[in-house]
Curated annotation (Swiss-Prot):
Chain sites annotated for binding anthranilate 2: R169
Positions contributing to anthranilate 1 binding: G83, N114
Native organism: Solibacter usitatus (strain Ellin6076)
Gene3D superfamilies in alphabetical order: Nucleoside phosphorylase/phosphoribosyltransferase catalytic domain, Transferase, Pyrimidine Nucleoside Phosphorylase, Chain C
Protein name: Anthranilate phosphoribosyltransferase
GO biological process: L-tryptophan biosynthetic process
Residues annotated for Mg(2+) 1 binding in this entry: S95, E229
Pathway terms, separated by semicolons: Amino-acid biosynthesis; L-tryptophan biosynthesis; L-tryptophan from chorismate: step 2/5
Length: 340
C-alpha cells in the first residue's frame, strides 16, 4: 500500500471518505510512508481543509492501533479533558489542573496529553514537575484511573505507532490534523469529554467527528479570544454532543458566575511559571486563574453527568479545591506512581 494515491487526491483538493482516510492513516502508522510523504500529506490536508469523514477515519485508525488501557469501571462515566494544544495563547495548563478538580469531585478521569510540541509547557511536563511519571505501563494507568480516580495517558506511550509521524510534526512546527486527532483518540474509551479546539471551524468538525464516533456526551469549545478552552475573557463557542446529536451554543462568563478576565490575566509561561500558577490554584488562591479552571471543570462535570448545570458544577469545583481534595489527588497519583 502507498500513501501517494491519497496524497494526490488531497493535492487535487478532493476529500477522502472515512474508509480512505482510515486506510491512509494506517499506512502512516505502519511506517509505510516516508517522512517527506507524511509531511506532504499533512500540508496538503491542511491546505484543502479537513472534513468530518476524514477525522472519523483517521481517528478509527489511531484508536485501532493504540495500546489499550482498560480501567473496567463497570458502567461508570470516564471523562477526558483534552485540548488540541498549540493555540499560541501562552496560557497555563488549564485543562490539566481542571482534570484534578474533576477527579476530586468524584468523576473518573483519563487525561490524554503530551509534552510540549508547539507551546512552552505541555500537560506531561507539568505532571512530571509534580512527581508524576507520565509513561506508566497501561495496566498501572488503568489501575490509577479506577482506584485513584485519575490517570494520565501519555500520547507517545499509548500511540506508539505515532513514532513514524512524530519527527515530521517536530520539524514542521505547525498545527496539523494530529492536533485535532489527539482529543478524538483516547485509548481508554472515555464516554464523556471536554475538548478544546483551535478555531470555531475545527470545533464544529471535531464535534461532528466525536458524535459519529459514539461519544455519549461532551463539549467541544473554542474561546472568542482564541483559547482552546472555555474562556473567561468573553464568549465561548460550544458544540454540545449528546448521543449522536450536536447542538451549537454560546457560553458566557456570566453562565458560570465569574468575572470577565483580561487576556493577560490568563497568561502562563515556562514550566516553572505554569507550575507556580497550578500550585496556587490548587492551594485555593482566588483570581482569574482559579476562575478559568473552575469554569472548565464545571463544564466537564456537566458532561460527565455529575452536575446538572454549570453553576452546580462550579459549586462542586469550589469544594474540590477549597477542601484540599484536588491537591490531594495530585499527591495520590504521585504516591501511586512512586509505589509501582
Amino acid at each position: 500500500m502507498s500513501l501517494l494515491p491519497h496524497l494526490m487526491r488531497l493535492v487535487e483538493e478532493q476529500h477522502l471518505s472515512a474508509a480512505d482516510a482510515e486506510a491512509a492513516m494506517q499506512i502512516v502508522l505502519r511506517g509505510e510512508a516516508s517522512h517527506a510523504q507524511i509531511a506532504a500529506f499533512l500540508i496538503a490536508l491542511k491546505m484543502k481543509g479537513e472534513t468530518v469523514d476524514e477525522l472519523v477515519g483517521f481517528a478509527r485508525a489511531m484508536r485501532a492501533m493504540a495500546v489499550p488501557v482498560s480501567p473496567n469501571l463497570e458502567g461508570a462515566t470516564l471523562l477526558d479533558t483534552c485540548g488540541t494544544g498549540g493555540d499560541g495563547a501562552g496560557t497555563f495548563n488549564i485543562s490539566t489542573v481542571a482534570a484534578f478538580v474533576v477527579a476530586a469531585a468524584g468523576v473518573h478521569v483519563a487525561k490524554h496529553g503530551n509534552r510540549s510540541i508547539t507551546s512552552k509547557c505541555g500537560s506531561a511536563d507539568l505532571l512530571e514537575a509534580w512527581g508524576i511519571p507520565v509513561a506508566m505501563p497501561p495496566e498501572a494507568t488503568a489501575f490509577a484511573i479506577r482506584e485513584v480516580g485519575i490517570g494520565f495517558l501519555f500520547a507517545p506511550a499509548v500511540h506508539t505507532a505515532m513514532k513514524h509521524a512524530h519527527p515530521v510534526r517536530v520539524d514542521l512546527k505547525l498545527r496539523t490534523v494530529f492536533n485535532l486527532l489527539g482529543p478524538l483518540t483516547n485509548p481508554a474509551g472515555a464516554t464523556a469529554q471536554l475538548i478544546g479546539a483551535p478555531s470555531s471551524h475545527a470545533a464544529e468538525l471535531m464535534a461532528g467527528a466525536i458524535a459519529a464516533l459514539g461519544l455519549e456526551r461532551g463539549f467541544v469549545v473554542h474561546g472568542s479570544d482564541g483559547l482552546d478552552e472555555i474562556t473567561t475573557t468573553g464568549p465561548t463557542l460550544a458544540f454540545e454532543v449528546r448521543n449522536g446529536k450536536v447542538e451549537r451554543r454560546t457560553l458566557e462568563p456570566a453562565d458560570f458566575a465569574v468575572a470577565i478576565a483580561a487576556p493577560e490575566d490568563l497568561k502562563g509561561g515556562d514550566l516553572a511559571r505554569n507550575l507556580e500558577i497550578a500550585d496556587s490554584v490548587l492551594a485555593g488562591a482566588a483570581g482569574p486563574h482559579r476562575d478559568i479552571v473552575l469554569v472548565n471543570a464545571a463544564a466537564a462535570l456537566v458532561a460527565a453527568g455529575k452536575a446538572d448545570t454549570f453553576l452546580e458544577g462550579m459549586a462542586l469545583g469550589v469544594v474540590a479545591i477549597d477542601s484540599g481534595a484536588a491537591r490531594a489527588k495530585v499527591k495520590a497519583l504521585a504516591d501511586f506512581a512512586a509505589s509501582r
